């Protein structure tokens, strides 16, 4: 936005609990033309579509702050599987067994998979992350959520695991 013009916020449709679509808003970290033709593209670790400011706010996770609105609206929780875009969900439902089970709980700002698996941008990565998401679905509760939140604070404050 400061470097590349365009809006400060980026809003996308995401898939939440029970497959319900909702709008997720983030601070925009990529160029305005990052997805030419409207085709969804997974972001990669060192994505060249990111702006300089975008790389900084992604590394510090500040780009995620506006998602608190989705938590207040009830579309998301603080902890749960990260919500994906409908295009990716459709593909992953076809290619990854049990992928839809992750939608039996609200998506979260942070999750077990984000703490346990490095940043990924492929079907194979989605399969690996799903193992952690399914573990969360089966075992979620107050104590587990608090543990995930505390570990997330460590990641944000000390940069461990930040992309």
Predicted segment positions?
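A hydrophobic, helix-centered structural microdomain
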Residues: 1-33, 70, 142-163
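Intrinsically disordered, low-complexity segments enriched in polar/charged residues with Gly/Pro
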Residues: 1-2, 17, 89-91, 101-102, ...
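A generic fold-level signal
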Residues: 4-7, 45-48, 71, 107, ...
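Gly/Ser/Thr-rich helix-start
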Residues: 6-7, 17-20, 55, 75, ...
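Short, glycine-rich, amphipathic interfacial segments at transmembrane boundaries or analogous
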Residues: 10-49, 110-131
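A short, structured surface patch at a secondary-structure boundary
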Residues: 43-106, 148-156
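C-terminal terminal-structure detector
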Residues: 94-163
């Amino acid at each position: 936005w400061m470097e590349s013009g365009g809006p400060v916020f980026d809003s996308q449709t995401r898939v939440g609990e029970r497959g319900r679509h909702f709008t997720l808003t983030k601070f925009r970290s990529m160029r305005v033309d990052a997805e030419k033709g409207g085709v969804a593209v997974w972001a990669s670790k060192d994505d060249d579509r990111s702006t300089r400011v975008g790389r900084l706010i992604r590394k510090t996770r500040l780009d995620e702050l506006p998602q608190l609105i989705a938590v207040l609206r009830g579309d998301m929780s603080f902890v749960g599987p990260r919500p994906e875009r409908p295009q990716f969900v459709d593909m992953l439902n076809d290619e990854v067994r049990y992928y839809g089970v992750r939608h039996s709980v609200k998506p979260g700002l942070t999750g077990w998979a984000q703490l346990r698996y490095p940043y990924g941008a492929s079907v194979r990565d989605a399969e690996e992350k799903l193992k952690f998401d399914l573990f969360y679905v089966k075992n979620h509760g107050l104590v587990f959520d608090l543990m995930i939140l505390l570990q997330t604070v460590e990641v944000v404050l000390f940069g461990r695991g930040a992309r």
